[in-house]
């Protein structure tokens, strides 16, 4: 059976079979068989192709790894777990964002602790100046989802107020061509803070502030699916969100 996922990935990337073969140092006919006959490459070749095309190895060849192997690899994506967000070292946030060379993604309701940190906002500006694409998703302050989250945390209208305050702190960033901020109307189960292949994921626990909920530090690795799950979630929310008006 043909590997349509691999074929589509090549088309979307604008890459030819010959170019893939040359890049990973195999015969072009070998790559063609991977596509037309569904042959599964060796692990090192799967990794090289996935990296070249910018997609997940597990997406291109989902049958290549057993569930146990996928689970074992995904476990290595967990760098550490903090019992509470306040237990994350203060400088860890700045170091995470400063490490970005390609993209920074943030999915929150207000993320006010980030917006109020002048040092981190400066890091955002510096990274944007360096060509890093920054996407921020804030809760729509007029949405029922934000209103309910405010009730759940016991601050009622305070959640919407925090979002509006965060926008004030981001005023200068919003004018940068590499920064885009959107409003979402999503029931969040996690807040996501991403810099390239690293993520800090803050779970949301009913009846408590996000600052008191656990945080996972993840690093995406080839063959793992945990980090990819959160990144796909971010993209889904982004696609449904609306740009914040200037």
Regions found by a protein language model. Name each.
Residues 1-19, 23:
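A short, Lys/Arg-rich alpha-helix, primarily the initiator
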Residues 18, 29, 58:
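Key DNA-contact positions within bacterial/archaeal DNA-binding proteins
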Residues 37-51:
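Short, basic-rich loop-to-helix N-cap that marks the start of a DNA-contacting helix
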Residues 54-69:
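Short C-terminal boundary/hinge segments that cap the last helix of small helical domains
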Residues 69-146, 231-236, 243:
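PLD-like (HKD) phosphodiesterase/transphosphatidyltransferase domain
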Residues 179-218:
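HKD (HxKxxxxD) catalytic microenvironment of the phospholipase D
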């Amino acid at each position: 059976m043909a590997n349509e996922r691999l074929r589509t990935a090549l088309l979307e990337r604008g890459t030819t079979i010959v170019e893939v073969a040359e890049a990973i140092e195999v015969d072009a006919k070998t790559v063609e068989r991977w596509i037309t006959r569904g042959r599964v490459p060796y692990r090192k070749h799967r990794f090289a192709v996935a990296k070249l095309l910018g997609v997940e190895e597990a997406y291109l060849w989902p049958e290549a790894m057993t569930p146990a192997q996928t689970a074992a690899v995904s476990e290595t994506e967990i760098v550490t777990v903090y019992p509470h967000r306040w237990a994350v070292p203060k400088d860890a946030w700045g170091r995470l964002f400063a490490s970005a060379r390609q993209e920074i993604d943030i999915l929150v309701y207000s993320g006010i602790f980030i917006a109020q940190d002048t040092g981190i906002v400066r890091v955002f500006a510096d990274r944007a100046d360096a060509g890093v694409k920054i996407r921020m998703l804030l809760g729509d302050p007029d949405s029922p989802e934000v209103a309910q989250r405010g009730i759940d945390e016991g601050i009622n209208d305070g959640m919407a107020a925090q979002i509006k305050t965060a926008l004030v702190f981001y005023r200068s960033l919003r004018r940068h061509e590499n920064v885009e901020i959107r409003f979402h109307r999503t029931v969040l189960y996690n807040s996501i803070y991403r810099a390239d292949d690293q993520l800090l994921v803050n779970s949301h626990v009913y009846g408590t502030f996000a600052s008191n909920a656990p945080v996972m530090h993840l690093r995406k690795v080839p063959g793992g699916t945990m980090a990819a799950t959160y990144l796909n979630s971010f993209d889904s929310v982004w696609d449904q969100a609306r740009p914040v008006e200037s």
